[in-house]
Amino acid sequence: MSAKAALPLQMFGRRLVHLRSSVTSQNMSALRLYSTEKQPEEATEQKATESSPEVEKLTKELAAAKEQNAELMDKYKRSLADSENMRNRLNKQISDAKIFGIQSFCKDLLEVADTLGHATQAVPKDKLSGNADLKNLYEGLTMTRASLLQVFKRHGLEPLDPINQKFDPNQHEALFQKEDKTVEPNTVVEVTKLGYKLHERCIRPALVGVSKC
């Protein structure tokens, strides 16, 4: 083979060697790149796998803590409500004690008011104009009773005069029945003794007569 014919063959061989070297170099670079990219991914997956039980444990502990917190909050709210109810009951008891502590004393004073009322009713009205002393006595009794009733009112004690009202067993005590067609049945047609209430609580029922049914 001549030198001129061998020269192209040598050049082709050199190109082939260079090409193989280039391909091998690129493959190695790709392999290294693949290996480098794969390692962090594998490490992340491995780390996630290793931490999964711990995350599950923490999740369960968090759920348990939330449930316990909800229970404690519910107990706290119930305790506050119970305390508020107890405070209201105590305040009402104290208020009732202040208001109704004089109830028995008021009942005794009612007898005085009744006596004054009977005394004024007993005075003959037709003789007042001709008897100055009797008139002064009557006026004195009337003023005394009126003053006593004003004192009662200031302390929440008021009379019950249920004439022509519907009979109420909570405030009235029926002594007799009376025929009266001008009113509906069970209506108070006569009051023989006034009742009294202390701050809306009946402390003495009115003694009454009611119409027949």
Curated annotation (Swiss-Prot):
InterPro entries on file: GrpE, GrpE_coiled_coil, GrpE_head
UniProt cross-references to Pfam families, sorted A to Z: GrpE
A GO CC annotation given for this chain: mitochondrion
Keywords (A to Z) from UniProt: Chaperone, Mitochondrion, Transit peptide
Molecular function as annotated in GO: adenyl-nucleotide exchange factor activity; protein homodimerization activity; protein-folding chaperone binding; unfolded protein binding
GO biological process, one term: protein refolding
SUPFAM superfamilies: Coiled-coil domain of nucleotide exchange factor GrpE, Head domain of nucleotide exchange factor GrpE
Family: Belongs to the GrpE family.
Name the UniProt record assigns to this protein: GrpE protein homolog, mitochondrial
